[in-house]
């Protein structure tokens, strides 16, 4: 918790160096404990942190209780969230969301929903601690309400839910701090994030003498009437990803994609489907008789 608080303090000072009035919303668990540590460190630096609590410090337990007690021991004060409305306070120039962490599985309570709405309504940047409050860390779904952060500092590792569903809009700029946990700790990730640094190691420069026939052949099946754009976009994506040859098996009454992208070949009747290195079934396929027939035909021939 001390490491998390120190990481947050350093991160906030780096990204908002001119900020002075910090409103730190703390919850009932360890996420709130991180907020109390942050408040203590910020006070030591001469800043003016205002701690706004969803639960009274005396009702906390474990590490969160110790962090709250240490904040109070240095002269820090705690304002309850329900007393915030109508209070005459200096406006914050930075808001820290330390309400809820990774344990959110059920819709937020009404009091917590109101606090989230308050955070979202403040005219100041929001730093989320570990992940935005209200986000399911596994599914990425907002559990009734969700803090929309300007930036999120995640700890140990990035949570899968931050990159999916509502999490994409909630996290803002996403960064993470390992807090000293090294790969040798044996933590096994549940998913892998594909970003440019990772992908560039998979896409090697080709020799000038390279031949398209040696770089993979893709057969795309879809492009039903009215949905030709889906298979066209999929075909263009295959080309940009490096596929050497791409054929489109689309509805016979659809205009040929080669009118838009000459590199995309058609798939006339009698084409050897074993030609393809990989077969993609679905972009704009539809559920009519033609689409179902194509689905069954190609699925039965998949390896």
Where in the sequence are the language-model features?
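Small-residue (G/A/S/T)-rich helix-start motifs and N-terminal tracts that mark the onset
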Residues: 1-54, 61, 151, 162-303
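Nucleotide and nucleotide-moiety/phosphate-recognizing core
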Residues: 9-99, 107-129, 254, 294
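Short N-terminal micro-motifs specific to bacterial/archaeal maturation
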Residues: 58, 106, 143, 222-225
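Short, conserved catalytic or adaptor-binding loops enriched in Gly and charged residues
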Residues: 68-73, 145-146, 166-169, 258-259
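Short gly/ser/thr-rich secondary-structure transition/capping motifs
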Residues: 75-83, 109, 134-137, 199-204, ...
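Generic hydrophobic alpha-helical membrane-segment signal
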Residues: 85, 89-91, 118, 142, ...
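A short, aliphatic-rich alpha-helical micro-motif
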Residues: 89-93, 146, 273-275, 299
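Internal gly/pro-rich beta-alpha loop/helix module
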Residues: 92-94, 99-190
């Amino acid at each position: 918790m001390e490491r998390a608080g120190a990481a947050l303090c350093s991160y906030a000072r780096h990204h908002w160096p001119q900020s002075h009035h910090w409103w730190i919303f703390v919850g009932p668990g360890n996420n709130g404990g991180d907020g109390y540590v942050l408040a203590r460190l910020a006070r030591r630096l001469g800043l003016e942190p205002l701690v706004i609590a969803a639960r009274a410090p005396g009702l906390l337990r474990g590490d969160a209780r110790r962090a709250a007690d240490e904040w109070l021991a240095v002269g820090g004060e705690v304002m309850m969230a329900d007393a915030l409305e109508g209070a005459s306070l200096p406006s914050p120039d930075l808001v820290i969301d330390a309400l809820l962490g990774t344990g959110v599985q059920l819709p937020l309570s009404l009091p917590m929903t109101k606090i989230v709405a308050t955070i979202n309504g403040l005219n100041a940047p929001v730093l989320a601690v570990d992940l935005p409050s209200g986000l399911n860390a596994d599914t990425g779904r907002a559990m009734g309400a969700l803090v929309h952060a300007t930036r999120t500092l995640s700890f140990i590792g990035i949570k899968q839910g931050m990159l999916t569903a509502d999490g994409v809009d909630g996290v803002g700029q996403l960064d993470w701090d390992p807090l000293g946990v090294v790969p040798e700790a044996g933590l096994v990730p549940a998913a892998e994030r594909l970003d440019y640094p990772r992908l560039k190691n998979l896409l090697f420069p080709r020799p000038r003498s390279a031949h398209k026939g040696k770089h993979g052949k893709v057969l795309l099946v879809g492009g039903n009437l009215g949905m030709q754009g889906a298979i066209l976009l999929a075909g263009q994506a295959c080309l940009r990803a490096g596929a050497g040859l791409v054929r489109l098996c689309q509805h016979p009454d659809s205009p040929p994609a080669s009118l838009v992208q000459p590199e995309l070949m058609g798939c006339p009747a009698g084409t050897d489907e074993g030609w393809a290195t990989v077969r993609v079934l679905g972009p704009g396929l539809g559920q009519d008789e033609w689409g179902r027939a194509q689905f069954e035909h190609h699925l039965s021939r998949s390896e």
